[in-house]
């Protein structure tokens, strides 16, 4: 029997065991397999199985380091029984070090949208309802919208002046910014803060006040264009960890809800020649994992949330 003559249910069973990242190679096997692998019902089934497997044993994240973007597998299975966690490279997705193009972004002065279909930029005029704001840190995407840390200089009654920090959301449907979204803490630029989207479901904040050794992780339990509420996911006193090595100035992180662990990416302090991952739990759990050598002393690893998908880029 030729491979193209196999019954559909058997083909789907075979394809369902193939990692999402390897489907392109499998599609070239034969025309029938290519058609089935792109079918909507199979796609939903395959992605559902991938999500279930991730929840049971491990999950995947996208990490940018050394001008390259990698898909990486994170395994926390058995950490309650003193089994060391791991972060393993799955594949390289893209390389940026040979690019001769650069995007110049001035968020204080203007907002532009790049359209991939038309390969063009669109300038958005008067998109900010409250006038000039300053945006800082990397933005994150959640359910089709983009969120940034922002701040605005405010003069209160009586002449008192201060920077007020908050989140701001850009709605790609209306091409407008929404109102301010409150943070669960009072933030100043002297403190360390980082934003993450968790599997296209929630926003996650890492907060480290400069005057304490406490690290806080906050997760959104309600997120809308005009409102957000937060719950504290984790609070850790970092002074309790004798191997506390990382700084929070270039912090990038992700969380695992099941094991209540945060993973912070950074470089070693002495030479900045190694990329490291720090696994931290609220019960005193602390592990350091090597992510490989680094030739770029000023380039810090950065993590993106990853949701399994069969969509081709």
Curated annotation (Swiss-Prot):
Bridged cysteine pairs (disulfide): none
Signal peptide per UniProt: none
InterPro entries: F-box-assoc_dom_typ1, F-box-assoc_interact_dom, F-box-like_dom_sf, F-box_dom, SCF_F-box_component
CDD domains: F-box_AtFBW1-like
Annotated ranges, domain F-box: 1-45
Gene3D superfamilies membership: 1.20.1280.50
One Pfam family in the UniProt entry: FBA_1
Name used for this protein in its record: Putative F-box protein At3g16820
Source organism: Arabidopsis thaliana
Classification of source organism: Eukaryota, Viridiplantae, Streptophyta, Embryophyta, Tracheophyta
């Amino acid at each position: 029997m030729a491979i193209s003559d196999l019954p559909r249910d058997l083909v789907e069973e075979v394809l369902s065991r193939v990692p999402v990242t390897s489907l392109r190679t499998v599609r070239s096997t034969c025309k029938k397999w290519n058609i089935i692998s792109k079918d909507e019902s199979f796609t939903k089934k395959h992605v559902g199985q991938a999500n279930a497997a991730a929840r049971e044993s491990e999950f995947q994240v996208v990490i940018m380091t050394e001008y390259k973007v990698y898909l990486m597998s994170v395994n926390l299975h058995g950490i309650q029984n003193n089994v060391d966690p791991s972060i393993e490279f799955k594949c390289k997705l893209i390389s940026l070090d040979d690019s001769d193009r650069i995007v110049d972004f001035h968020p204080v002065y203007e907002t532009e949208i790049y359209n991939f279909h038309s390969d063009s930029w669109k300038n958005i005029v008067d998109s900010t309802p409250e006038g000039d704001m300053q945006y800082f840190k990397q933005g994150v995407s959640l359910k089709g919208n983009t969120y940034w840390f922002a701040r605005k200089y405010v003069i209160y009654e009586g002449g008192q002046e201060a920077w007020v920090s908050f989140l701001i959301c850009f709605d790609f449907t209306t091409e407008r910014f929404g109102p301010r979204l409150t943070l669960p803490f009072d933030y100043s630029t002297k403190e360390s803060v980082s934003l993450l989207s968790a599997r296209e479901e929630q926003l996650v904040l890492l907060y480290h006040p400069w005057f304490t050794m406490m690290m806080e992780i906050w997760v959104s339990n309600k997120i809308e264009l005009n409102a957000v509420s937060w719950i504290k996911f984790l609070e850790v006193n970092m002074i309790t960890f004798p191997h506390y090595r990382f700084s929070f100035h270039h912090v990038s992180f992700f969380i695992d809800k099941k094991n209540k662990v945060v993973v912070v990416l950074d470089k070693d302090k002495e030479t900045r020649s190694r990329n490291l991952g720090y696994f931290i739990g609220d019960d005193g759990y602390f592990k350091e994992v090597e992510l490989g050598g680094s030739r770029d002393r000023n380039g810090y690893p950065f993590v993106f949330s990853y949701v399994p998908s069969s969509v081709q880029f």
